[in-house]
Swiss-Prot record:
<feature type="binding site">
    <location>
        <position position="262"/>
    </location>
    <ligand>
        <name>Zn(2+) 2</name>
    </ligand>
</feature>
<dbReference type="Pfam" id="PF01261">
    <property type="entry name" value="AP_endonuc_2"/>
</dbReference>
<dbReference type="InterPro" id="IPR001719">
    <property type="entry name" value="AP_endonuc_2"/>
</dbReference>
<keyword id="KW-0862">Zinc</keyword>
<feature type="binding site">
    <location>
        <position position="232"/>
    </location>
    <ligand>
        <name>Zn(2+) 3</name>
    </ligand>
</feature>
<feature type="binding site">
    <location>
        <position position="217"/>
    </location>
    <ligand>
        <name>Zn(2+) 2</name>
    </ligand>
</feature>
<keyword id="KW-0540">Nuclease</keyword>
<feature type="binding site">
    <location>
        <position position="183"/>
    </location>
    <ligand>
        <name>Zn(2+) 3</name>
    </ligand>
</feature>
<dbReference type="GO" id="GO:0003906">
    <property type="term" value="F:DNA-(apurinic or apyrimidinic site) endonuclease activity"/>
</dbReference>
<dbReference type="InterPro" id="IPR013022">
    <property type="entry name" value="Xyl_isomerase-like_TIM-brl"/>
</dbReference>
<feature type="binding site">
    <location>
        <position position="180"/>
    </location>
    <ligand>
        <name>Zn(2+) 2</name>
    </ligand>
</feature>
<feature type="binding site">
    <location>
        <position position="107"/>
    </location>
    <ligand>
        <name>Zn(2+) 1</name>
    </ligand>
</feature>
<keyword id="KW-0479">Metal-binding</keyword>
<dbReference type="GO" id="GO:0003677">
    <property type="term" value="F:DNA binding"/>
</dbReference>
<keyword id="KW-0378">Hydrolase</keyword>
<dbReference type="InterPro" id="IPR018246">
    <property type="entry name" value="AP_endonuc_F2_Zn_BS"/>
</dbReference>
<feature type="binding site">
    <location>
        <position position="67"/>
    </location>
    <ligand>
        <name>Zn(2+) 1</name>
    </ligand>
</feature>
Length: 286
């Protein structure tokens, strides 16, 4: 059975995220471990972490995935921003360890005009610094590097960029990949049909290695292929379309992975409706 979920809120308490995921029939889910829009945060209380672990353990769903906050920029050439980004990454690894969450997803950031090579180097240095500063329990957490749509100065839109960063880090075994389908499509990887998907997975294998793919952010794309626009839309209703989304969900290399949707909630569909759409498309076509 394909594992399908969405990003859910932690409003009220982090343990309530499990209830919210169960209420809309998630098999897996993603959260922010704290307010994602600021640098400051409250420490995660041991009691709250224990409540989350207990709720998750009895729910029968998982894996749970934590996403890094919005502000960190691991590729930044600005020392203060880079240092704060390393601190944020170190803290999130610790929080994942407390929550017993196996995966932490991070964007790689922007090089601010310094060039892709410089950006890759800063990301590698940031990851190594966070790993060296983190507590021993954090070594159980796998850091997943997420591909980008290829917006200006971004790092990680090409699979080979992610592969180079991973291989250059001091402990690559602690690093995997989360592939966002909208971002990949916007970056120029075709996912609309079987031929396009096969070529995209070949590029992933060549650039990174398919064995390092652990989570898929399943999002349809509002903008066309190669647009470099990060615009998510409802599953099957965008430019990737039903055929493309179904092909991703049923591909034998991908079908066993957790699929997490980061789609809008609006008058067209809410999260529950997108999950139902994904389940329908996850049935292999005759």
């Amino acid at each position: 059975m394909v594992k399908i979920g969405v990003h859910v809120s932690i409003a009220g308490s982090i343990a309530r995220a499990v209830e919210r995921a169960m209420a809309i029939d998630c098999d897996t889910f993603q959260i922010f471990s704290r307010n994602p829009r600021g640098w400051t945060f409250k420490p995660l209380a041991e009691e709250d972490a224990a409540l989350f672990q207990g709720a998750l353990g009895t729910s029968g769903i998982g894996p749970a995935v934590v996403h890094m906050p919005y502000l960190p920029n691991l590729a930044s050439p600005k020392e203060e921003i880079w240092r704060k980004s390393v601190e944020a990454l170190t803290e999130e690894l610790h929080r994942c360890s407390m929550l017993d969450v196996p995966y932490l997803v991070t964007h790689l950031g922007h090089h601010m005009g310094e060039g892709i090579g410089a950006g890759e180097g800063r990301v590698q240095q940031a990851i190594d610094a966070a790993f060296s500063q983190s507590d021993p329990g954090s070594s159980r957490v796998m850091l997943l590097l997420e591909n980008t749509a290829g917006e200006k100065n971004s790092v990680g839109s090409r699979f080979e960029e992610i592969g180079r960063i991973r291989e250059s880090c001091s402990d690559p075994d602690r690093i995997g990949v989360c592939m966002d389908t909208c971002h990949a499509f916007a970056a120029g990887y075709d996912l609309r049909n079987e031929v396009g998907l096969s070529r995209t997975l070949e590029a992933f294998e060549d650039g990174i290695g398919i064995e390092h793919l652990h989570v898929i952010h399943l999002n349809d794309a509002k903008a066309d292929i190669g647009s470099h626009l990060d615009r998510h839309t409802h599953i099957g209703l965008g430019m990737i379309g039903e055929e493309g989304c179904s092909g991703i969900l049923t591909h034998p290399t991908l079908a066993s992975l957790p699929f997490i949707c980061e789609t809008p909630e609006d008058a067209v569909r809410d999260n529950a409706a997108n999950i139902r759409a994904v389940r329908r498309l996850a049935v292999p076509r005759a």
